[in-house]
Amino acid sequence: MAVYTDIAEDDLKWFLTEYDAGTLLSYKGIAEGVENSNFLLHTSKDPLILTLYEKRVEKTDLPFFLGLMQHLSARGLSCPLPLPRRDGALLGSLSGRPAALISFLEGMWLRKPEAKHCREVGRALAEMHVAGDGFELKRPNALSIDGWQTLWEKSEARAGEVEAGLQDEIRGELDFLAAAWPKNLPAGIIHADLFPDNVFFLGDALSGLIDFYFACNDLLAYDVSICLNAWCFEKDGAYNITKGTAMLEGYQSVRPLSGEEIAALPVLSRGSALRFFLTRLYDWLTTPEGAMVTKKDPLEYLRKLRFHRQIKSPAEYGLSL
């Protein structure tokens, strides 16, 4: 979450009249994240999240995102729900941006997740994959192989500002992944961004998943690899196999991975590491000064990518083969 667009209090109060949301008491921007402008609203009824969708989010994708949250919630997954307007629409407009009100989910994200939390995340990810079955809208993954190439082309000329010699390494990685990427693994709805700040806990109990604005149709095991990258590395860059084992056991307690999915994990993990390296690199080079947004270090994911290149067997992630 982040704030790129400011809102005037009078405009917000007028916006809220289109909803059965109560009277505005207070609001504040939320700085975490990089995609949209988000605000926490306190009203005379319930707290709400107001999201203004910025230019990177295609307006035509919003029915998919908002409808998916409704679909998953109806199937028992704990996630935010969009609040309909009085006319039944899920989407409004505020400060020149498409805007939606989303229910507030109780809980906090973990700054120092442990293996027991990784197990819960693995289980919740699998539950989301199962619950997503039957959702009729489709959204291709814009941040897969073709999207990575486009991002790299936008960043390549300045990549040396982050680390010398990146051009040859990343071009080689893109070529490898284009040739090695699996094509016939189980696919469905994936979250595609299930980082610690998108998972809420109350104590040690997982209370819900948030931020579905990268969700799309893609390989389910690719989503697993994203979580391995996001949850199972320590601050010093070391892979924590105890966390990896817990994550994978939690996932497979709900949806066992096929042999083909397990064999593909090293390639998928290289791909997901490259994906987040490239988006972080692009944001690092292009985010305007003064934006209320937390920029993230792209080199963290370059180090993870280099780790995955050294993997000889999926067992090194903590799988029992």
Curated annotation (Swiss-Prot):
User: Domain of life here?
Assistant: Bacteria
Which reaction equations make up its catalytic activity? L-homoserine + ATP = O-phospho-L-homoserine + ADP + H(+)
The enzyme's E.C. designation: 2.7.1.39
Q: Does the keyword Kinase apply?
A: yes
Keyword line: Amino-acid biosynthesis, ATP-binding, Kinase, Nucleotide-binding, Threonine biosynthesis, Transferase
* CDD domains xrefs: HomoserineK_II
InterPro entries xrefs? Aminoglycoside_PTrfase, Homoserine_kinase_II, Kinase-like_dom_sf, Pseudomonas-type_ThrB
Q: In which pathway does it act?
A: Amino-acid biosynthesis; L-threonine biosynthesis; L-threonine from L-aspartate: step 4/5
Gene Ontology molecular function: ATP binding; homoserine kinase activity
Q: Give the matching NCBIfam families.
A: PRK05231.1, thrB_alt
Give the family from UniProt: Belongs to the pseudomonas-type ThrB family.
> What name does UniProt use for this protein?
Homoserine kinase
